[in-house]
């Protein structure tokens, strides 16, 4: 017997029972994005490797350790996308979407990072991102955060996420802070683990993200990033906080929040939760005003965020179990024997014409009434339509409410209106 081939570790199948809740959550997210004027952009899964090295930073964990990079048959270095912003910026430059224009874009799809798989964190994961180009004021930063807050309310998880904010300033301000932080860390190298010692010179701001409790205690005495901000960044951040206060959105200023990608400046934010065990990030983003120019375009202000859908699905299931998937089937059509199957299929097509969007399944494969009603239950149908020889002869169909058990014979010409009433 041939050996079974299984999915790659950390790359999961999502089966019909799971995809239904994904579809409902994604539909909610997309509806909110549309209400704020965002348009979808669809991007390649594979990009040229230099795109991510230039955008994310060569000395980041993503580029150094986590990217799936390979050489194609032409000898070009290609990479499965580890995040979406770089590809979105590349597409905007390539197609002339960004120069002197305001754009509000969103994308959704799989991303890839070679990490240790754990709950809610996989090597192939799904991300929804939104990016705004051409606007530089704190008002658009605030609106992006308001958009995400509206998501949480729509999904019933608003009480289980909290917002952390910071400003990491301009490139110049960050360079000054970097020097001060390195000088501090050099004086306390005995407390640093090997990872922090490596990062101290390659990307010292990442030391602020260390989970090592000894390093965290040391950082309590480290220079504060907020003390090195330029005046424009201070004003921008104060404006953002004022707008969030006016909108009633609670937040905590976390001066150790820096984000793991090099392209960020000024505003950075994360929505975090404690409802999945240890604290985890649900959604994160910030401003990246230099990235478009860095990738070959003209200087363009930009801000955006991304959200891991696996973790979001887990959170919704954990704290709002009433947010259930829509049933696969609204109506199940039961046919009494092979001689009525053609009439049943004709009626089903007619109802699909008259009731766009209805989820209607016709029984196939025969079976007595008991078996067919069991199938209707399996698919979660609310209503069964029963068509026998007598109903075919007199142009009626029996409509049975599978919740109440009530049933009535209805003329086929008027059954669509009757079904609309029952389905609400």
UniProtKB/Swiss-Prot annotation:
Disulphide-bridged cysteine pairs: none
Q: What is its EC number?
A: 6.1.1.21
| Reactions listed under catalytic activity | tRNA(His) + L-histidine + ATP = L-histidyl-tRNA(His) + AMP + diphosphate + H(+)
- GO cellular component term, pick one: cytoplasm
Q: What does UniProt give as the signal peptide span?
A: none
Q: Which SUPFAM superfamilies match?
A: Class II aaRS ABD-related, Class II aaRS and biotin synthetases
Q: Which GO terms describe its biological process?
A: histidyl-tRNA aminoacylation
Q: Which InterPro entries match?
A: aa-tRNA-synth_II, aa-tRNA-synth_II/BPL/LPL, Anticodon-bd, Anticodon-bd_dom_sf, His-tRNA-ligase, HisRS-like_core, HisRS/HisZ, HisRS_anticodon
What superkingdom heads the lineage? Bacteria
Q: Which key words are in the record? A: Aminoacyl-tRNA synthetase, ATP-binding, Cytoplasm, Ligase, Nucleotide-binding, Protein biosynthesis
Q: Name one GO molecular function term.
A: ATP binding
State what protein this is by name: Histidine--tRNA ligase
Its taxonomic placement starts with: Bacteria, Pseudomonadati, Pseudomonadota, Gammaproteobacteria, Enterobacterales
Gene that this polypeptide is encoded by: hisS
